[in-house]
Amino acid sequence: MTYEIIFSDIALTQLKKLEHKIQERIIKSLERIRIRPEAYVTKLVGDPGYRLRVGDYRVIMDIDKEKLHILIIKISHRKNIYK
């Protein structure tokens, strides 16, 4: 059972603004978590979401275990992501 990855409009725009090499790393990491996301992501403190670390970048997401969806909310450099 694999999860479907859905990008928010904001996350898709943020991904497209990154360098091609970084885009590839993030997409490769997202493909890896489709089978068992809990093994790769960290729960955010005080927030219902999760984060995935990809080098200096963070991917903020929400995981719907019933519908098997991973909603990518935000993608940004670690110094800007939590602002």
Where are the language model's segments positioned?
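Enriched for short, Lys/Arg-rich terminal
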Residues: 1-5, 9-24, 35, 54, ...
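A short, surface-exposed loop/turn module that caps and links secondary-structure elements
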Residues: 28-53
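Juxtamembrane/interface motifs at transmembrane-helix termini
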Residues: 45-46, 61-63
